[in-house]
């Protein structure tokens, strides 16, 4: 699928954000492990979450899903899978990482694999921790990377995990921990990447009945005496998906309102709104949504986005049209996403005339006169959506492989077509 974006200005748009991918993944796994029946209301039905659903069904969980609800019969902490279970998670890092620890709760060993890019995404820190807690983790191709076969049992105890590459490693252990043989005392070393996602994990676990004591983002103690209980769980709206429409208002000028956002959400990508406000946009919060309005030039800022990784590329697009430089730090872990997002973003902006300096943990974007061009997002949904928004600001940008947005936001192009008309 190829999409060419025309230049637009004076945007007036009201949309409802899709449900959160992060919450949907975690609610699915908690419900699958719970005792009793759960209904997940307003889940995100996208490629990644469908992979999690399919994998849980392969592990023996009874699931019925439609576009509005997902019903699960929990397995009470023991997946009744069959010998030789293989879970192909394609390029869904969240699915593979969260399910890796849960695989220790399966009757038979589980092999997790994925796309060529997935096999380049590190899993070593999680494997070391699972081995310390009673698992038997075997990498079948390259040490530290999928494919991986996971057996053994989650015995519990004290362990450490390196959180500098991804907070999903710690989230994975935490989500399985209520069903360990003993309590789990997990210490996160390094500077935790995307630490706000640990708040999401802990929140979902608590909602399903787990008991967690924590010391900030450094230590999590999970009881094995309080298991998950089936319940009805309503998935909140996604701030990262909403960011593309907020960026439209900033880049094209105009006013965009996004409904379906919890004002008290712990999602780290809320930081994107603070960034827009600092750059010159007017941001208004209401009970069930947020409005962003911009009628003038944007000013560059310096900001640490370590807690809001999924909106870094969107912010880069806004920075590219600002009248002063922008410095974004705390982004080193983006190298391990669906693509090396730091390198890809810098390269594609330069193709459009941007002046960009990319380093290990930061990116600097200077004011420049931009022009159109052809953008290959290398099958990365967030790259495609970010450059689409920039395309509506400057015109003449063509996105190839545009269907990759289905990974997290199947309705993206349909909504954007309202602006393109």
UniProtKB/Swiss-Prot annotation:
Predominant location category: cytoplasm
Subunit description: Monomer.
EC id: 2.5.1.19
Residues that hold 3-phosphoshikimate according to the record: 21-22, 26, 166-168, 194, 310, 337
Name of the protein this chain belongs to: 3-phosphoshikimate 1-carboxyvinyltransferase
Origin superkingdom: Archaea
Binding site for phosphoenolpyruvate: 21, 93, 121, 168, 341, 382, 407
Functional summary from the UniProt entry: Catalyzes the transfer of the enolpyruvyl moiety of phosphoenolpyruvate (PEP) to the 5-hydroxyl of shikimate-3-phosphate (S3P) to produce enolpyruvyl shikimate-3-phosphate and inorganic phosphate.
One of the record's GO molecular function terms: 3-phosphoshikimate 1-carboxyvinyltransferase activity
GO biological process: amino acid biosynthetic process; aromatic amino acid family biosynthetic process; chorismate biosynthetic process
Keywords on record: Amino-acid biosynthesis, Aromatic amino acid biosynthesis, Cytoplasm, Transferase
Cell compartment(s), UniProt: Cytoplasm
A Pfam family this chain is assigned to: EPSP_synthase
GO cellular component terms, A-Z: cytoplasm
Reactions accelerated catalytically: 3-phosphoshikimate + phosphoenolpyruvate = 5-O-(1-carboxyvinyl)-3-phosphoshikimate + phosphate
Catalytic machinery residues: 310
Cited CDD domains: EPSP_synthase (cd01556)
Pathway: Metabolic intermediate biosynthesis; chorismate biosynthesis
